[in-house]
């Protein structure tokens, strides 16, 4: 019988000796249309001195089943539940992205690799050579948990460049093109007797909205009042050419500004946001049922036709 082993830094939690219970959730989207999040939680006993810090947040956790490494995760929390008992909760690299903010911004031809690495921060990521130099145009919003996260902005980039995300066993994220071959075969022994399949209405056409952002001259007040040093002002839409009166702008981007202490007003100029619908008929012989993608704001004049073709192939 294979034994579960969990390595937390230099500490090994092994099988029946001190691993008392646990759950591992390893999930893969068959269509690669969702950035799935893996998790691990377990209860274990430790013979270490009670004053020893067992692990720190973000420390690497490696899960083995028998001799086979199954996943690399990271400590999200570790709690002492008794004199020598602990509870560990670990998350995957994609799960870490769901806890991270990303300020977004306006993109005017930056490479996909530079944007992806900026979104992932300290999480290691490899972008396949045929994707890394793809130029990206458009806008990403300010994403901050719990309502949104860096994971959402990464998903936007992947959609725009036609890529999927996988995770190596060492925890490194890998951005690569979709593969049209057979990944695996699920035989009768692995099927669920109570499973069901929903036969959805056939799609007649698909559409995507192409976005264009250009600097405009319409001014908008973004903040008026008293601020503490370092206060963060987040905009509802992208802005440029910020102007402050009564305090200074310490740091800014298209979606935000950090300001110094003072009482005054912050203004900015709006971007002109133009949209164009790109539609493609899939099947003329079915009732009208169009499937659309409207809020993918990295779909631009440069890639809108390619995105529409990929969406048509998907459906």
What are these regions (language model features)?
Residues 195-315:
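Charged, gly/pro-rich, cysteine-poor intrinsically disordered low-complexity regions
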Residues 26, 33-34, 38, 96-101, ...:
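N-terminal export/assembly leaders
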Residues 1-25:
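Polar/acidic, low-complexity leader/linker segments enriched in S/T/G and N/D
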Residues 27-54:
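Acidic, glycine-rich low-complexity segments with interspersed aromatic residues
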Residues 2-7, 45-130, 180-184, 254, ...:
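Surface-exposed cap/loop segments at beta↔alpha junctions
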Residues 2, 74-97, 130-215, 246-274:
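Short beta-strand-centered interaction patches in the first periplasmic/extracellular domains
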Residues 111-115, 149-154, 307:
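Stable alpha-helical elements in mature extracytoplasmic
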């Amino acid at each position: 019988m294979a034994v579960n082993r969990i390595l937390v830094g230099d500490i090994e939690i092994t099988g029946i000796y001190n691993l008392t219970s646990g759950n591992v959730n390893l999930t893969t989207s068959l269509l690669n249309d969702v950035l799935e999040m893996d998790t691990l939680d377990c209860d274990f006993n430790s013979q270490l001195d009670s004053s020893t810090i067992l692990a720190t947040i973000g420390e690497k956790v490696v899960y083995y089943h028998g001799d086979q490494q199954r996943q690399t995760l990271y400590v999200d929390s570790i709690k002492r539940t008794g004199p020598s008992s602990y509870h560990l909760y670990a998350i995957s690299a994609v799960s870490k992205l769901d806890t991270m903010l990303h300020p977004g911004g306006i993109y005017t031809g930056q490479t996909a690799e530079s944007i992806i690495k900026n979104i992932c921060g300290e999480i290691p990521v490899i972008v396949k050579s045929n994707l890394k130099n793809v130029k990206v145009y458009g806008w990403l919003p300010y994403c901050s948990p719990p309502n949104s996260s860096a994971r959402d902005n990464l998903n936007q980039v992947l959609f725009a460049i036609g890529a999927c995300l996988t995770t190596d066993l060492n925890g490194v994220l890998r951005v690569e093109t979709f593969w049209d071959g057979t990944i695996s075969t699920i035989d009768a022994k692995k099927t669920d007797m109570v499973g069901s399949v929903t036969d959805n209405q056939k799609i007649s056409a698909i559409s995507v909205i192409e976005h264009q952002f250009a600097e405009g001259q319409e001014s908008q007040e973004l903040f008026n009042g008293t601020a503490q040093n370092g206060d963060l002002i987040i905009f509802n839409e992208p802005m440029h050419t910020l102007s402050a009166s009564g305090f200074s702008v310490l740091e800014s981007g298209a979606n935000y500004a950090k300001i110094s202490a003072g009482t005054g007003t912050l203004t900015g100029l709006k971007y002109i946001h133009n949209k164009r619908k790109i539609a493609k008929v899939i099947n003329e012989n079915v009732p009208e049922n169009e499937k659309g993608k409207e809020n993918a704001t990295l779909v631009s004049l440069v890639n809108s036709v390619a995105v529409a073709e990929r969406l048509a192939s998907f459906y």
